């Protein structure tokens, strides 16, 4: 899912910001970087990427905003809290939730260091992402903004994955109470015949062990099959004697 997210940097003037943004992306599992008319991509870009050189190296470099987002069906642009954008303003957490729920390609666009995105560029965005920083000092540099948004994207991605894992647990086929009771009775009977269980304390511990294991039905069938094989061996031994 994260591979569908493209971070777009518009006309970045400080080459080091490109490297720092790439580092911020990689720490959160993002890999798709697009640069629109950067002033330069140089040694400082690579030096400040600090292990994310591959993201800088593989960054797509284009000439315009339109070219950067041409194959994306959801475009989110960073913006100050402007009155005429109130209906489309979202904060990083809401942005991340929308992004991870989306099926197509997504571009998250960060504007120029000094002036951000132009009004024309903002009009081409479906949503406008505003970071609710301290109003008395709201100055975030480009890489900081990328790090913050990338973090929220990763957290939303992990939450979504946890939900999927929870659903997969629910969908697993677990034995009924009656089936477990049959298994426990069968286990106790076989183990008693082997002389393994001398008192109920051992059986209680075995039950706790099996409950902790959260046996699925097919796993219980395997254990019942093992008990059946042991029972047949016991019967054969009795016949031989």
Curated annotation (Swiss-Prot):
The record's section on Pfam families has:
SpoU_methylase
Q: Which domain of life is it from?
A: Bacteria
SUPFAM superfamilies, per this entry?
Answer: alpha/beta knot
One GO BP annotation is:
tRNA nucleoside ribose methylation
Which parts of the sequence bind S-adenosyl-L-methionine?
78-80, 111, 131, 138-140
Keywords, ordered alphabetically: Methyltransferase, S-adenosyl-L-methionine, Transferase
A Gene Ontology molecular function term of the record: RNA binding
What's its EC?
2.1.1.-
Signal sequence interval, chain numbering = none
Mention any one GO cellular component term assigned to this protein in its UniProt record. Answer: cytosol
Query: Which family does the entry's similarity section mention?
Result: Belongs to the class IV-like SAM-binding methyltransferase superfamily. RNA methyltransferase TrmH family.
**Name of the protein in question:** Uncharacterized tRNA/rRNA methyltransferase HI_0380
